[in-house]
Regions:
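Flexible "cap/lid" loop of the alpha/beta hydrolase fold
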Residues: 73-114
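Conserved alpha/beta-hydrolase "acid-adjacent" motif
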Residues: 128, 177-183
C-alpha cells in the first residue's frame, strides 16, 4: 500500500483508545488512525456525529458496542466506508429481559465494571482484565451508561446487511461468551464480501487480548482488498 489508509477505530463499551493502542502500533506504516468516541443514547446520533468528524472515505474498525456503531455508520453512509473490520459483533436486537447495564452503571458502577471485566476477556488473562478496568474508569459510568442505552435500543439489522458491499473482516474469539463464533459466522455470511476469522484462546476483545495476531489478520485483509477490484456500492 503506497499511501497510509485513513482508518477510524471505535472502541467497545467503556473502552478508550488503549483498546487499539498495540494494534495501531503494529499497523502504523499502512494506516492513518483516528480513534473516535461518541457516547450518546442512540446509535444513530453517535453515527451522525462520527460521520461529521471522519475523513471523506475511510476504513472502519469497531469492537462490540463499537462494531454495532460501525454497522450503523456503514449503513448510513456506505459510500464513505472503504472496508470494515468488526470484532465481537452481534447484529441482532437485544434479547428481551436481558440485564439493564445502563441502570447498573448509574447505580453501582464499580460492581458493573468488575462484572464486565470478568466476562469480556478470558478469565485467565488478568492483564487484559486490568486494562479493561482502567479504561472503564477513565471513560466513566455516565458515558458507559449512554453507550449501554444505545445498545439496548438498537434494531435488528440482519435484513439490511446485504446492503454492505464493501470488503469486511469479521473477527471473533473462540471463547467469546457475548458474541460467540456462530454469530460471527452468520454475520460474515450475511454480508456479500465478508471474511470470517476465528481467534483461538481469545475472548470478546481481540485487539486487547491478542493485538499482534489481530493486527496481522487486518494487515493481510487490507493487502488482499487492495489487490482485488472493488465491488460496486
Amino acid at each position: 500500500m503506497s499511501q497510509r489508509l485513513p482508518t477510524v477505530f471505535i472502541p467497545a463499551l467503556l473502552c478508550d483508545e488503549m483498546l487499539y493502542r498495540e494494534v495501531i502500533a503494529v499497523l502504523g506504516d499502512v494506516i492513518e488512525p483516528q480513534v473516535m468516541m461518541s457516547p450518546q443514547a442512540k446509535l444513530a446520533d453517535s453515527a451522525a456525529d462520527i460521520l461529521a468528524r471522519a475523513p471523506r472515505t475511510f476504513a472502519l474498525v469497531g469492537t462490540s458496542y463499537g462494531a454495532n456503531l460501525a454497522l450503523a455508520i456503514a449503513l448510513a453512509a456506505p459510500e464513505r466506508v472503504s472496508s470494515l473490520w468488526l470484532m465481537g459483533c452481534d447484529a441482532s436486537a437485544p434479547a428481551a429481559g436481558g440485564p439493564d447495564l445502563a441502570a447498573g452503571l448509574d447505580a453501582t458502577p464499580d460492581a458493573i465494571i468488575d462484572f464486565l471485566a470478568g466476562i469480556v476477556v478470558r478469565p485467565a488473562d488478568h492483564a487484559a482484565s486490568a486494562a479493561f478496568k482502567a479504561m472503564a474508569h477513565r471513560v466513566g459510568a455516565p458515558a458507559g451508561a449512554a453507550q449501554a442505552r444505545a445498545l439496548a435500543g438498537r434494531d435488528d439489522i440482519w435484513s439490511r446487511l446485504g446492503e454492505l458491499r464493501m470488503p469486511a473482516l469479521i473477527l471473533t474469539g473462540d471463547e467469546d461468551p457475548i458474541a460467540p463464533p456462530a454469530r460471527g459466522q452468520q454475520l460474515a455470511q450475511a454480508m456479500p464480501h465478508a471474511r470470517f476469522e476465528l481467534m483461538q484462546q481469545c475472548g470478546h476483545l481481540p485487539a486487547l487480548e491478542q493485538p499482534a495476531r489481530a493486527a496481522a489478520l487486518f494487515h493481510a485483509f487490507l493487502g488482499e482488498d487492495a489487490a482485488q477490484p472493488h465491488p460496486a456500492r
